[in-house]
């Protein structure tokens, strides 16, 4: 890690590390480099920001994010103890909702998600995506949130970049039969562009 600030502000993609319970990365802001550590516990995300100075990490602020309806509510406490509360949310623009001619396919949805918020982190963006994506549980969905983090982290790309303003989604719902039982499969593909040439993530869910 370096404390030197590049010309471009945002997240250093090569610094992103994802484990079962955490996501860590370096983010460049106007006043320098920060090490960000986000811990996931159920539907609660704790984001700690450390200013990198002369090779040392100095804790500067903490954001605790949780779910409230379709929004992510973030409560930030800075080094002086001042508290600020704001929301992060995903806004869906639905393009089409068309039926497939294939007998097993029920529906194909195409839509985009725009991320809106004062300070959007990788983990809070991931949580916002789970709240507005079709067929994804919004409570007790720790594993889903982790998968969303991978999608958003993949969207950052090489070098230093900000989180994407939009994600474009194709979601297919299909019905299958196995051993006399019917189950449904939900396939979601996430893209960076409206032409859907840059695939960055895929989720599959099965439900009886």
Predicted regions mapped to residue ranges:
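N-terminal propeptides/leader regions of secreted preproproteins
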Residues: 1-113
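Transmembrane alpha-helical hairpins and terminal membrane-anchor modules
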Residues: 151-167
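Extended, compositionally biased eukaryotic interaction scaffolds
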Residues: 1-3, 127, 152
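Extended non-catalytic interaction/regulatory regions in multidomain proteins
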Residues: 2-9, 133-145
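Hydrophobic alpha-helical transmembrane segments
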Residues: 142-154
């Amino acid at each position: 890690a370096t404390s030197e600030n590049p010309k471009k502000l945002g997240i250093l993609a090569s610094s992103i590390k994802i484990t079962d319970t955490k996501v860590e990365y370096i983010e460049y802001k106007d006043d320098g480099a920060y090490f960000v550590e986000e811990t996931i516990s159920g539907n609660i995300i704790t984001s700690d920001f450390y200013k990198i100075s002369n090779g040392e990490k100095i804790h500067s602020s903490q954001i605790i994010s949780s779910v409230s309806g379709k929004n992510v509510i973030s409560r930030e406490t800075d080094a002086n103890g001042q508290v600020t509360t704001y929301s992060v949310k995903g806004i869906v623009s639905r393009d089409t909702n068309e039926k497939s001619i294939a007998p097993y396919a029920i529906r194909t949805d195409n839509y985009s998600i725009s991320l809106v918020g004062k300070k959007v982190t990788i983990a809070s963006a991931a949580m916002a995506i789970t709240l507005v994506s079709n067929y994804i549980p919004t409570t007790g969905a720790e594993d889903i949130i982790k998968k969303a983090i991978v999608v958003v982290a993949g969207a950052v790309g090489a070098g230093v970049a900000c989180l994407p303003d939009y994600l474009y989604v194709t979601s297919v719902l299909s019905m299958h039969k196995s051993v006399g039982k019917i189950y449904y499969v939900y396939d979601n593909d996430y893209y960076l562009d409206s032409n859907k040439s840059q695939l960055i993530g895929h989720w599959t869910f099965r439900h009886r």
